[in-house]
Amino acid sequence: MGVWLHFGYVRRRKLYILDSMIKTAYTCFSTDVIHEGHLNIIKEGKKYGRLIVGVLSDKAKVRSDRFPVIPFEERFEMIKNIDGVDEVVEQNNVLYDEVINSIKPDYVVHGDNWNEYPDSIIKENVIKNLSKYGGELIEIPYTYNAKVLKINSIMREKLAMPEYRRKRLRQLLNLCPIVKVIEAHSGISGLIAEKTIVERNGELDQFDAMWVSSLCDSTAKGKPDIELVDISSRMRTLDDILDVTTKPIILDGDTGGQAEHFAYNVRTLERMGISAVIIEDKIGLKRNSLFGTEVEQTQDTIEAFCNKIKAGKEALRTEEFMVIARIESLILEQGMEDALKRAFAYVEAGADGIMIHSRRKTPDEVFEFCDKFRQREKQTPIVVVPTSYSQVTENELVQHGINIVIYANHLTRSAFPAMKNTAVEILKNHRAKEVENNIMPFNEIIKLIDEL
């Protein structure tokens, strides 16, 4: 009996030693569809030992990559069922610190298509973490062929389709602590919103959605912001942006016009794939809210504005499009109680979100509104536009229950001074050499604009 115990111990000891000698390889996928490039990485990775594949979480994917067409759970199962994969784990950050420190793989296997910013940040992060214990990076030549490129193109085009884009704002509200929205007023500004990714404090980040502002749309056309640019022209701008981007769009709907007209416009926006429209509770000639009481502005009655909200909601054919009510009580100095009274009434009428606006230089009254609103209404999204109180951080907004922050006019306001300065310098110097260092190189323009 003792001999058998001895042999059993020896056998287990040998297996333990063999297990400890087996190398571990790790790779991570964020893809929604497996093509031969991924299969090649799995095949090559398997040569180095036991292969663990990380699947990037939905929350991490929206910070650094395209929005997931397939949810994490389905992507996890898809990878799990591929031959050659020994284990599948969730990767919760696009950078590898956490997963490498946890698994300590002998090798990280990746395609060689990550040498340009921002992907180069991920590569540097992997090398840094592997160097801590002598791990090795294995780069596999990326599979460039017509089939792979076609699959990538189809997945991008799928994200741009109305039925996928329209619902994405609601999905982002469930994934992100705060949805970050940047203004776009043309196809090129839409591409900037779409493609800008930064690295900060060890994380990659990007904007989640785009805001098509009536102010910026009017300014780009050289017209005043008084609803002079009609809805047909606004929709042409939307179409230009929709044509070259995939991110969800929120439209600045001004007052929404007549309730009967608003219903038809909502139906059109929903069909186009717009995610939301924000309408303000004012009537009469539209004037920019940041003028406040310096110009004549008239607030709509609660009853009439509720009827407009209801008209828009009743026109919808899906539950994906959002009608968001913008409250002007603080702008027009009608007081906090009026703002809250309106907010609760608008939610009762069917508003999918509340935007509270202020022209104060500090966020105090906005925070007071949000705190009081949240005491009673826990779920309805709150939207803010911190144009006048720009010092506030997104983390501060989250602490007060705010769900969406819109940087409403900043691409327009930064573009025009740059263009004016270029014009001045050329006139002053009678040549263009002096502006060369301040303008975009041609190769960057080419990279920004996608070809079919």
Q: Where are the regions a protein language model picked out?
A:
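Nucleotidyltransferase catalytic core that binds NTPs
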Residues: 6-162
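Receiver (REC) domain switch/active-site residues of two-component response regulators
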Residues: 49, 86, 106, 208, ...
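Short secondary-structure boundary segments
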Residues: 55, 92, 111-113, 141-142, ...
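Short gly/pro/ser/thr-enriched loop/turn and capping motifs at secondary-structure boundaries
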Residues: 59-61, 115-117, 145-146, 217-219, ...
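Short, basic, helix/turn surface patches
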Residues: 81-83, 112-125, 136-142, 237-243, ...
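Electropositive, surface-exposed helix/loop patches at the edges of structured domains
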Residues: 91-94, 149-152, 251, 309, ...
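Extended, intrinsically disordered, low-complexity segments
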Residues: 159-169, 188, 410-452
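Alpha/beta enzyme core
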Residues: 163-248, 253-382, 392-400
